[in-house]
Amino acid sequence: MTLADAQPQALDFECETGNYHTFCPISCVAWLYQKIEDSFFLVIGTKTCGYFLQNAMGVMIFAEPRYAMAELEEGDISAKLNDYEELKRLCMQIKRDRNPSVIVWIGTCTTEIIKMDLEGLAPRLESEIDIPIVVARANGLDYAFTQGEDTVLAAMAHRCPKGSAVVEESEKQERGNAITSLLNFGKKKEEVVAEESEYHDHAPLVMFGSLPDPVVTQLTLELKKQGIKVNGWLPAKRFTELPVIDEGYYVAGVNPFLSRTATTLMRRRKCKLIGAPFPIGPDGTRAWIEKICSVLDVEPKGLEEREAKIWANLEDYLEIIRGKSVFFMGDNLLEVSLARFLIRCGMTCPEIGIPYMDKRYQGAELKFLEQTCIDMGVPMPKIVEKPDNYNQVQRIYEHDVDLVITGMAHANPLEARGINTKWSVEFTFAQIHGFTNARDILELVTRPLRRNNSLKDLGWDKLVKEEAKV
């Protein structure tokens, strides 16, 4: 063996700038309107945007949900109608019917093309209707649909209160950490004070990223076990409970697609970003907590045993996927984190397609992926940015992979060609963060493999056309 062969292989990056499929970022409304309970989302776009939202979330239309579509008409585009007056009419109606704490305007491709000055209109209208208006350009010019959330959170980061601002005591209590209130529910004041003393003395820490409430509670409790207090989450359950973010605060992201929010917090609010792998899978969650502990100068405890216990509980799933290969076509920017976890589970991954890669924000995750490949003794995956789907299909045939994680556009065509697929969008909506939710990831990944094994056992994988006897 030569010295060159002994050197560890590095990650191979490539950019194809090809045609790939993903949803439109305005789909972020689907989960954000449920997360921020006192909000109202107004999507300003054409009928096409309306059809997309109606198809994606049509079941909820009849429940009068807290989102709506402001359809641009010929008069808007030809500048015959006054944008301000039209938006004022709609926002007054929203205030009258729903009275939200915040209205979020979602800009679309059309508002970009006709140069509608939403940022200029919002402050005027806000002072008139006395409701905060947040403007987010979550349009189809982004790389992936999850970046819609990134745009909204970056806009909301500007609305987070500063600690230096003069705030009345009653307002402070109201704005207090909702998670802390939930965890302390039903406890006596003495117990709460005793619990507060369990925390280490460290700089304030704020998390950013929209997660379901049970997952937020789980991650907050995991950090609490290490003596780390989470001062707040962006977004909060209510707009009125946005966390205080001041200069020198530490911030940590929970999703790989939030690079714009991270940049806003660092540049505008002078926060310090904790660059950690993301808490997806037991390995990622442990690395995430350890990195936060090291930055805040806290000694982590019990994480190795916690991770080992989770891996032991996953053994029934690991037996199904160990030694198999997975191919990511690229859709939601979760690909690198999921690939790292699945490689740790014993799979191989020849290629990770990803619509957009921010190497600075995902730097820790990429290093962790490299280390995982070295530890597991498997080849490094090729990371293809902006992949060309036609070329990817050829490479899927070449590698003869066992599973392809793909967008909905390619799932059925690949299945028809005898290739096992899993919709990548399911990982966006499933609870995949933290120690305990690793089982949910493996449930999704193994489902197509288990289904096809069951069909083979039943003898349904071969359809025989019998001669019709007339």
From Swiss-Prot:
Say if the entry is tagged with keyword Zinc-finger: no
In terms of Pfam families, this protein maps to: Oxidored_nitro
EC top class, as a word: oxidoreductase
Q: Which GO BP terms, alphabetically?
A: light-independent chlorophyll biosynthetic process; photosynthesis, dark reaction
Claim: Oxidoreductase is one of the keywords in the record = yes
Name any cofactors this protein relies on. Answer: [4Fe-4S] cluster
Gene Ontology molecular function: 4 iron, 4 sulfur cluster binding; ATP binding; metal ion binding; oxidoreductase activity, acting on iron-sulfur proteins as donors; oxidoreductase activity, acting on the CH-CH group of donors, iron-sulfur protein as acceptor
Q: What is its EC number?
A: 1.3.7.7
| Catalysed reactions listed for this entry | chlorophyllide a + oxidized 2[4Fe-4S]-[ferredoxin] + 2 ADP + 2 phosphate = protochlorophyllide a + reduced 2[4Fe-4S]-[ferredoxin] + 2 ATP + 2 H2O
- Mind telling me which InterPro entries this protein's record contains? LIPOR_BchN/ChlN, Nase/OxRdtase_comp1, Protochl_reductN
* Keyword set, alphabetical order: 4Fe-4S, ATP-binding, Chlorophyll biosynthesis, Iron, Iron-sulfur, Metal-binding, Nucleotide-binding, Oxidoreductase, Photosynthesis
In which pathway is this protein known to take part?
A: Porphyrin-containing compound metabolism; chlorophyll biosynthesis (light-independent)
Co-factor binding details: Binds 1 [4Fe-4S] cluster per heterodimer. The cluster is bound at the heterodimer interface by residues from both subunits.
Highest taxon of the source?
Bacteria
**Assembly state and interactors?**
Protochlorophyllide reductase is composed of three subunits; ChlL, ChlN and ChlB. Forms a heterotetramer of two ChlB and two ChlN subunits.
Q: What does this protein do?
A: Component of the dark-operative protochlorophyllide reductase (DPOR) that uses Mg-ATP and reduced ferredoxin to reduce ring D of protochlorophyllide (Pchlide) to form chlorophyllide a (Chlide). This reaction is light-independent. The NB-protein (ChlN-ChlB) is the catalytic component of the complex.
Q: Which family does it belong to?
A: Belongs to the BchN/ChlN family.
* PANTHER family documented for this protein: LIGHT-INDEPENDENT PROTOCHLOROPHYLLIDE REDUCTASE SUBUNIT N
Name of the featured protein: Light-independent protochlorophyllide reductase subunit N
Query: Gene name on record?
Result: chlN
